[in-house]
Curated annotation (Swiss-Prot):
Gene Ontology BP terms: translation
Species this protein is from: Carboxydothermus hydrogenoformans (strain ATCC BAA-161 / DSM 6008 / Z-2901)
Subunit structure: Part of the 50S ribosomal subunit.
CDD domains linked to this entry: Ribosomal_L30 (cd01658)
Family: Belongs to the universal ribosomal protein uL30 family.
Protein name: Large ribosomal subunit protein uL30
């Protein structure tokens, strides 16, 4: 079974760089406290590392 990650946006993207806003959007997050479930891949992990200060991540 493939590992999954539960990713929640816990801090606003207002005041962040355009690059960080684009990364959050590419993760599928738009609103504060919105949660998405993504596969645990190196690509997703890289995006999470770039904006880790805005996210809460849990392994499922």
């Amino acid at each position: 079974m493939e590992k999954k990650l539960k990713i929640t946006l816990v801090k606003s993207v207002i005041g962040q760089s355009e690059r960080q806003k684009a990364t959050v959007k590419s993760l599928g997050l738009r609103k504060l406290n919105q949660t998405v479930i993504k596969a645990d891949t190196p690509e997703i992990r890289g995006m999470i590392n770039k904006v880790s200060h805005l996210l809460k991540v849990e392994e499922i």
